[in-house]
Design a protein with these regions (language model features):
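Long, basic/Gly/Ser/Thr-rich N-terminal segments
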Residues: 1-16
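Hydrophobic residues at beta-strand termini and immediately following loops
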Residues: 5, 105, 214-216
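Nucleotide-state-sensitive switch-loop elements of NTP-binding domains
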Residues: 14-41, 45-54, 59, 63, ...
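G-domain G4 guanine-recognition motif of GTPases
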Residues: 56-57, 82, 86, 140, ...
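Conserved C-terminal guanine-recognition region of P-loop GTPase G domains, centered on the G4
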Residues: 146-154, 159-210
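Canonical P-loop GTPase G-domain recognition
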Residues: 189-244
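A short, charged, Gly/Pro-tolerant segment at domain boundaries
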Residues: 241-260
Length: 260
């Protein structure tokens, strides 16, 4: 974990009698929440849906966004992606080669994106927010720390590759509990790897009962058209994000109006 994550800190020693303790992790999260709220107002004023895409490394986030960008391009819709990685801009260059407006963020040793990083990346977007149809924040590959940090998104999306197994929601409950939408990716490989769909759905229902679930495949394109329709025209009106925070118990609130 990185030095800025609350989960990286050792338990503090007992405080002397009569003293006050300021938990730096809490202060960091509070500052991030304030910056995220400002971003959310900015996105709402632009009428722009924004996704925070979270997954394990290698789950297929970038490949999925390449195909989603192609699908949107056929409809004359504009997609932009802010790409978070510890090092290199390889994924951003992949997306740019596919015709997607992409801005990289290299976090160094930080295992997640923060609202301030996103705000700085917005200044490097070649198009104003008002001219975009969808903005995706591709978070650093990690199912732990990103769950704690609000980025001003209107929807939080967790991608679970079928190659990772059915038990990921049980092992990493905070990320899945925080999701408005869970994507079962690489769905064309489910039979090959013996993915138990019913068991995965049961785990998701236990951990993330308010999340919508969609199956997609970047390789075959299956589910992408339906996914795009859902993102741009959800069945229920999205409510304003209710951020209750990810404090202590490792759980956070979601926009319940985004259920499918």
């Amino acid at each position: 974990m990185c030095a800025t994550c609350p989960c990286a800190a050792d338990p503090p020693p007992a405080a002397p009698a009569g003293s006050r303790r300021l938990t730096l992790g809490q202060a960091l999260l509070q500052r991030n929440d304030q910056q995220a709220a400002a971003l959310r107002r900015r996105f709402q004023q632009a009428g722009l849906p924004v996704l925070n895409l979270i997954s394990s490394p290698g789950s297929g986030k970038t490949a999925l966004l390449e195909r989603l960008g192609a699908e949107m391009g056929q409809r004359n819709l504009r997609l932009a992606v802010i790409v978070g990685d510890l090092a290199t801009d390889r994924d951003a260059r992949r997306l740019a080669a596919a015709g997607v407006e992409a801005v990289p963020i290299s976090t160094g040793q930080a295992c997640h994106l923060e609202a301030a990083m996103v705000a700085r990346a917005l200044e490097r977007l070649p198009l104003p927010l008002e001219r975009l149809d969808l903005l995706v924040i591709e978070n650093v590959g990690n199912l732990v720390c990103p769950a704690a940090f609000d980025l001003g998104e209107s929807l939080r999306v967790v991608l679970l590759s079928v190659c990772e197994g059915e038990d990921k929601p049980l092992k990493y409950p905070a990320s899945f509990h925080s999701a408005d939408l869970v994507l079962l990716g690489k769905s064309d490989l489910a039979g090959v790897v013996g993915f138990d769909r019913a068991q995965a759905l049961a785990h998701l229902e236990a951990v993330a009962p308010g999340a919508a679930v969609r199956e997609v495949s970047a390789r075959s394109g299956a589910g992408l058209e339906a996914l795009l329709e859902w993102l741009l025209h959800p069945r229920e009106p999205r409510q304003e994000w209710e951020w209750r925070g990810w404090r202590g118990a490792g759980m956070r609130g979601t926009a319940k109006g985004a259920e499918g």
